[in-house]
Amino acid sequence: KARPQREAWVVLACRGNKVLLERRPPSGIWGGLWSLPEFPTRQHAAQWCREHLVGGSELQPEEPLKHAFSHFDYDINPLSVRCAGKAPALRDDDRYRWYDLAAPAAVGVPKPIATLLQRPRR
């Protein structure tokens, strides 16, 4: 029988060589790992960018990525945006951090997200 499908939109907020990562909640999928900010719809993602990024460009859809979990298939829809920075509300603390693609920090990142981060950026 067909496996359940789920989808999410993730934001690749790029500032120079850095991408903004968000720590996931301790429970649930990829609990406690660093990932891209994730949203149930493109509209939610766009709204978050307007509220939390400084000098954000238009959102550019990138090629989706499929990932299979044991119980369902996950479609990840990346939206990339160039920005000058993030709103003061998103402090560099235990929830958000800039991840340098040129010198990756040793943080736990889910494999599909690592795959996205390794794609060449325009």
What does each of the following model-derived ranges do?
Residues K1-R122:
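Intrinsically disordered, low-complexity, charged terminal extensions of DNA damage-control enzymes
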